[in-house]
Amino acid sequence: MIRRELAAVVSLLALLTMALTVPSSAAPRPLTVSTDKGAVAGATADGVDRFLGIPYAAPPVGTRRWQPPAPASAWSGTRSATAYGSRCLQSPTGTGPGMSENCLSLNVYTPEQRTNRPLPVMFWIHGGGFSSGAGDLYDGSQIAKANNIVVVSINYRLGVFGFLDVPGLSRQGAGNYGLLDQEAALRWTQRNIGAFGGDAGRVTIAGESAGGHSVCALLSSPPARGLFAGAIIQSGGCPSLTVAQATAKGEDFATAAGCSAPAKSVSCLRAKPANELLAAGSGFTGGILSGPLPVSGVPELPLAPSTAVRTGRIHNVPLLIGSTRDEVRQWALPFANATKEQYERAVGLEFGAQADAILAHYPYSAYDSPYAATYAISALWDDSSVFYGLGGCQYQNLTAQFAARQPRTYFYEFDDPHPPTLATTPAGFDSGAPHASELGYLWPMETSKLLTPEQQQLSTAMVRYWGAFVKHANPTTGGLAAWPSYRSGTYMSLLPGDDSQALKSTVYADRHQCSFWNSISYDGLTTNPDQLAAQAGVPTS
């Protein structure tokens, strides 16, 4: 069932991120820009210049599979940039451009009407568990036009193609090829964004979920120094694997792919067709809490990002960071049929000696619902941040660590109680504000079409807040509630209508019972929800 649950999460993200088609109210106007590799011809529609599918690195195929990204080759003449490039290989999700190993491209959106003064740049890194997603799922036209900024979205290698580490691979980039792709795209941006009207000195990296994890990793990566001036982390933490963990995971994949002999595994894997590797990679990419992650203890990530943040060894840039209020509620659905006894057994299995204290704070009886166990266990998971540190108390602590060194740190919680969702859930189940539910408020997606007038008002406000941060390293902007820094003792509660407001940080701490969680010792969740539910005896249907 874990595959089914993970597939539901990935499919939800894919559905959420189905970009709308280019508006047709204005005829596209062709235009040409010169890059360091050659000229590209994009098109203008509805006030936004769009340049799509521009290669920023050489195709990582053949002997370049599992190598750091190499420079793209120059081209003669003018290259068409009116269609998205291929998505990086992943399990099929939804519609869109085809998939290919030759996928290292990016997209640039810039306002048609602009002055000669270079514009700030928002550099977007997509989520999807480092296993799915693509830059084309995020149409940057709306954010670019509304804020008079440039938006860049990218593809990077995913799954076994982006995060494999096995003995025999060159230590340069092993396990972190996707992260190195992101850095290569940032270097392309530094070299070329001026030709598109952007300011290379004012690049803000931003991402959600795995994209947010990536932002934290880039903040911790010495080779990324100087490539950006600000950062936005949405529902992302700072997780990573050790080299030993990554190579063990890689060896399991090599065995599944029929390349178990250590001395020959790399040559064997490189000789495999990409589709065979993709088929063999389900164990590598699948499973909540068991998917690929960046690898630390290597030159591009000498320290685990969480350690780098805690000790201050990061690129000290302004930061906007936050999460949704109910990050993991939908991931707790394996407990939909759980009884009180099964819920309590699961908490005991996961938290051991701390279980009684936790159950006193999260009693089954607090939820008068057929889904009481799901609501109770998701609440304690949210508040304790046991899923990669997402949301809750560890997330507030992470923000405090950033803010201790960077005064321009801004914290939020997406608090819309009923955002649109395309996820399939049981009748009567309240998803709250789950993981990724804020995306349709910032980018034009399928869920964007379902926003109520009050939610649309929040969407407009969020687009403006994010744009203000990209432009000024401060999200406060005229006509909206002021957003003080975290150092002022406040965070922003994002609500529909005009109800968004800055609240005291103690409100967040009380909401998530942080006095309790900060008083006990516990580890992150090590058992995925399906397995934990099965161990507790919860029926599957």
What name fits each language-model region?
Residues 2-26:
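Secretory targeting and sorting signals
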Residues 27-176, 448-462, 473-479, 500, ...:
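Non-catalytic accessory segments of hydrolases
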Residues 92-94, 191, 225, 234-349, ...:
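Substrate-access "cap/lid" subdomains that shape
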Residues 103, 173-194, 245, 251-252:
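Alpha/beta-hydrolase active-site loop
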Residues 127, 177-181, 209-212:
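Active-site loop->helix "elbow" adjoining a glycine-rich segment at hydrolase catalytic centers
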Residues 196-208:
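Alpha/beta-hydrolase fold nucleophile elbow
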Residues 212-224:
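Short glycine-enriched nucleophile-adjacent loop
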Residues 392-541:
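Mobile gating loops/cap/lid regions near enzyme active sites that modulate substrate access
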